[in-house]
Amino acid sequence: MKITDVKTWVVGNPPPGIGGKYFIFVRLTTDGGVVGYGEAYNATFGPHVTARMIEDCAERYLVGRDPHDIETFFRRAYSSGFTQRPDVSMMGCVSALEMACWDIIGKEAGKPVYKLLGGQVHEALRSYTYLYPHEGSVHTEDVAPKNVYNDPDLAAECAALYVEQGFNAVKLDPAGPYTAFDGHQPRLIDIDLSARMVKAIREAVGTKADILFGTHGQFTASGALRMARAIEPFDPLWFEEPVPPDMPEVMAQVARGTSIPIATGERLTTKWEFARVIETGAATILQPDLGRSGGILETKKIAAMAEAHHVQVAPHCYCGPIVGAANIQLAATLPNFLILESLKQWDGFHEKLLKKKIEWQDGNVIPSKEPGLGVELDEAVCEAHPYSGKALHLHMAPDPLFP
């Protein structure tokens, strides 16, 4: 079996836009006509540049080769351009292509990928969702001034609704804006709002749901500890990425100073970056994103390292349903799995992109028994929703926010 063709799509994500403004998908085809799908959690370049990078990577290291040779593909791509170091853009390409290879491998074997990675540990996977506005766009620049992101009453109402639907864990991120400049001290207004938001949600859901407190590296260690003290009384399940991800030694200072478990990993890639998190004691919950972390096999290795240190894994997902499907395949095999990020109930445009919806029941994702990744991308929907813009998937404020 050899890979003979690669094709990419940059697909626009219509309102409400859960998962980002667009998704980047790839299809690999073998000489026997078997196809596999993958997806990148976008890199540091525009989406069409990234799509071309995926094609270039495939043409260099996969076309004409056997998709079973995952380790060889990873090593060649990891060493591309004389680098041999974690490169988030290259690993986004590798991750997309590697999961497409696994999709092919599973289809050829007639088995779900989880059956080829040690077998199924979990019949159902506990899931959580962010709190999203009920109507209109979810992007912060488009929402009304008063919304679930900044109003305790609306957040509590939304959380209670999700619990009624079956979720037993919800996430919010009210801790203030992100800046390209380094971590800062939170403003008192941000600490106060965060505490009021978490308090309102706790009062609304009681003990029926865990609360996941999301941040994205906004703070210094001391600033993060000030925030942690304010929300500790409401017993969040985790405090996510309290400081920038480049210095796990600093994150470890936060971990030692709070009773809230620290979670991190969506901006990390490969076993080498995650090893530093584990070795320094920076987090007890890892959040690899399979569209960036190096692929399914690489993330299985990350999870094994974590297991040896009694660290749990909670796969991250803020993109399209192919990364979601890959997360499900891996999570089903992990003894140290904690919880899975869902984009609500995998409905809306995520459902339209697939020929068969990801199954969600009573707060859990149910792993598919179909071969490969267990889902099939609807290529006609991809073709009907091209994205022509140049925006980055996510971005930070380019200027200092608190001069």
Task: Mark where each language-model region is.
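Extended hydrophobic packing segments that form well-structured cores
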Residues: 373-403
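Structured beta-strand/loop patches that form or line metal/cofactor-binding pockets in enzymes
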Residues: 1-37, 41-44, 345-351, 400-403
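Ligand-binding pocket scaffold of soluble enzyme catalytic domains
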Residues: 30-32, 37, 108, 126-127, ...
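Shared catalytic-loop signature of beta/alpha-barrel
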Residues: 29, 56, 72, 86, ...
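Metal- or metallocofactor-binding catalytic centers and their adjacent structured scaffolds
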Residues: 29-109
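Metal-dependent enolase-superfamily TIM-barrel catalytic cores that perform enediolate-based chemistry
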Residues: 124, 129-253, 257
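Conserved, mostly hydrophobic/aromatic
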Residues: 3, 33, 58, 97, ...
